[in-house]
Amino acid sequence: MRSLPALPKRLHGPSIWALYILGFLPAVWGFYLGATGRLPGNAVKEFEHLLGIWALRFLIATLAITPIRDLFGVNWLRYRRALGLLAFYYVMMHFLTYMVLDQTLLLPAIVADIARRPFITIGMAALVLLIPLAVTSNIWSIRRLGQRWNKLHRLVYVIAAAGALHFAMSVKVVGPEQMLYLFLVAVLVAWRAVRKRFLRWRRQGTAPMRSQARAG
């Protein structure tokens, strides 16, 4: 299994911080466009949508780390935590934009909106599930929780599916963009289901080759 080529170990930490900086650029740029009146239509809705779509992208990127390693041998595991936390930060910004700028903190209207619109109910449920994952994304929690940590963090697949569904249900007509994200999440969830069988099949397939190499 090879890791990222031509990246010295001393650059692993700086590269993760660079990922955080790059990861926040869409939010900063979107806020700038909104503040200067350059977002089309309803600026609040557009900014809210931008944050939500980037949250979903970072969730998908987080889930894609393992299949990329399994299929192509490229180890990006060191970036998975950063990608997952970026997804959480974008979900929180998406949520706060909805609460503060869209609904202006009118709690009765917010509660009614959650109850009346299923896609918002699903989005809120995904946020609630995501919070414990973000809180436990650290070495101390991994050591403290042990195997329970792995079970807890499998919820990310449910969260990603809920996020894609939230996005698809938020529009009047499901278009190619919504279908793409639903498809990507479905593929990643399916990979999770077949991963062990695939790895077992690959090990069985490479075992005779290793035996022949030793015999030769």
Swiss-Prot record:
The keyword Transport applies. PANTHER family: PROTEIN-METHIONINE-SULFOXIDE REDUCTASE HEME-BINDING SUBUNIT MSRQ. Heterodimer of a catalytic subunit (MsrP) and a heme-binding subunit (MsrQ). Its main location: membrane. The chain crosses the membrane at residues 16-36, 48-68, 82-102, 119-139, 155-175. Belongs to the MsrQ family. This is Protein-methionine-sulfoxide reductase heme-binding subunit MsrQ. Binds 1 FMN per subunit. Part of the MsrPQ system that repairs oxidized periplasmic proteins containing methionine sulfoxide residues (Met-O), using respiratory chain electrons. Thus protects these proteins from oxidative-stress damage caused by reactive species of oxygen and chlorine generated by the host defense mechanisms. MsrPQ is essential for the maintenance of envelope integrity under bleach stress, rescuing a wide series of structurally unrelated periplasmic proteins from methionine oxidation. It is found in: Cell inner membrane. GO terms for molecular function: electron transfer activity; FMN binding; heme binding; metal ion binding; oxidoreductase activity, acting on diphenols and related substances as donors. The keyword Cell membrane applies. GO terms for cellular component: plasma membrane. Its cofactor is FMN; heme b. It is a multi-pass membrane protein. Keywords: Cell inner membrane, Cell membrane, Electron transport, Flavoprotein, FMN, Heme, Iron, Membrane, Metal-binding, Transmembrane, Transmembrane helix, Transport. GO terms for biological process: protein repair.
